[in-house]
């Protein structure tokens, strides 16, 4: 399940709370993964800590990954990987194993794996 929602303020706040996350977890098949946008780690570390605190109430495995988003504030955006059955490393391995390499101007398997390598300050946001 991929959720590209609005920011966690006002009417969108419910999309960043444990009840919604638990509903999504219940909808996943065995081995399923839930991903949601989780804000700019440069601008909103406290919001991210709150997001992961709520995610931990619904999922056993969490991880942050980053992507360059030039149209977003700071150009760096975070996303939350969540599952009750699959760890982040297993997800990376599964993605690499289950796909054929394709030639693009940007994406490659190494970049995919590297997206999950976080600066220490961002790791602390996830682990708080």
Predicted regions and their residues:
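Short "lid" loop at the C-terminus of a central beta-strand within the Rossmann-like core
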Residues: 7-8, 39-44, 70-71
């Amino acid at each position: 399940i991929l959720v590209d929602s609005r920011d966690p303020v006002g009417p969108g706040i419910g999309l960043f709370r444990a009840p919604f996350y638990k509903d999504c977890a219940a909808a996943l098949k065995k081995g399923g993964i839930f991903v949601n946008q989780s804000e700019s780690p440069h601008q909103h570390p406290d919001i991210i800590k709150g997001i992961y605190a709520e995610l931990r109430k619904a999922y056993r495995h969490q991880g942050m990954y980053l992507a360059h988003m030039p149209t977003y504030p700071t150009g760096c955006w975070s996303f939350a990987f969540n599952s009750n059955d699959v760890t982040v490393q297993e997800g990376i391995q599964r993605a690499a194993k289950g796909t054929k390499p394709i030639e693009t101007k940007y994406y490659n398997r190494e970049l995919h794996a590297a997206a999950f390598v976080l600066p220490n300050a961002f790791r602390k946001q996830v682990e708080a």
